[in-house]
Amino acid sequence: MESVGDVLKRQPSRFHYQDLVQKIMKDPDVAAFIQQESLTPEELNRSISKFNQYITERDKFLRGDTDYIAKGYKPILVMNHGYADVSYEETPELIAAEKEAAIKNRLKLINLPASLKKASLAQVDLDDLGRLPVFEKLLAFVEQYPAIRKGLYLYGDFGVGKSFMVAALAHDLSEKRGVSSTLLHYPSFVIDVKNAIGDGNVKTLVDEIKLSEVLILDDIGAEQSTAWVRDEILQVILQYRMQENLPTFFTSNFNFEELEQHFARGKHGNDETWEARRVMERIRYLAEETRLEGVNRR
């Protein structure tokens, strides 16, 4: 950092000390600080080099110089035991970026597009009136959480935006309630669980999911269902979340009746209706069946 003395040594023919001091004192930011803090003559003398440092750093900041090292922070003047000093505070842009990063860090997406982290309820297209009932329920959940615990089971046609809606919910829960959510593509999770059998990691995968603060199972019913996955994986997750009263959301192309039929189809055509109903009892307890209307957006 170049001091006042360095400036005078470098350009002795152009600057005299008093001329430089007057130039520094006339700087609008410096003058405002002097008036605000009611600096005495002694304090002014002790502060000249810091005022010069401030002006240099401020101008670099405003120009966006590449050699400005405190990226995301702007220089400010503060009092420091009888003289002015230079400090740095976060810019509004850095604060906003850090806030958005914190929001996204609370959203865990598993086998889903990272772009869903950008979704928010404010982006929901309400010109499509079919979305309004679901939008209102999701908004109410955010506003009333944690008093409200029951999730939604969103079903509807392919491409109407079910995944976007629940991702928007997760974003707003993070932003407004500081809540962490796990958004999980269920068919891919089923494959991951099957692959984990050989490694002995099934319990680790299941525990990670069932303990989520808010859990969203996306596209349930699209997986290749087996009795083992249904009874030993899904039911374990749902049972835990039911017992602990943890918010759980679902999306599906099936309504409740169709999903039960999906779970009831055994590997060899066996009727497994009773087992399917046990799973559905837990889903019904955890989530309200809600149809999402709308146009295909894909």
Regions found by a protein language model. Give the residues of each.
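N-terminal pre-Walker A segment at the start of P-loop NTPase domains
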Residues: A114-I148
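Walker A/P-loop nucleotide-binding motif
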Residues: P146-A167
